[in-house]
């Protein structure tokens, strides 16, 4: 029985494919669901990479169940962000809503995809309430338990 329990989470992760990220909701958005599919960005060489050798991905989001942004506070739009795993760099990918959309390109080695309610759809700096988030496949082996945010210490 113990072996079966260990296999189930791995099977659940693989069901989405190696380049799909299941986005997790928050207590403030219990009905929100989403996936982010990472698709290699266009390149004449077949695979797009940065000068440092990091893969470049276009992010395609499929979202449902997001409430109106105003239900979370003084917000008017949802914006998708690509975020480094240390939470120091937030790169705006674009405005999103329920449905499917390709929002932008991310080229971090390990990263998070975050959908947040923001005061404006053109927001260039994250300041709003997080509605959905997920970790890139390259970040699955990293633990965030040691990050100050999760230990109750301000970064």
Where are the predicted features?
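N-terminal targeting/export leaders
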Residues: 5, 13-155
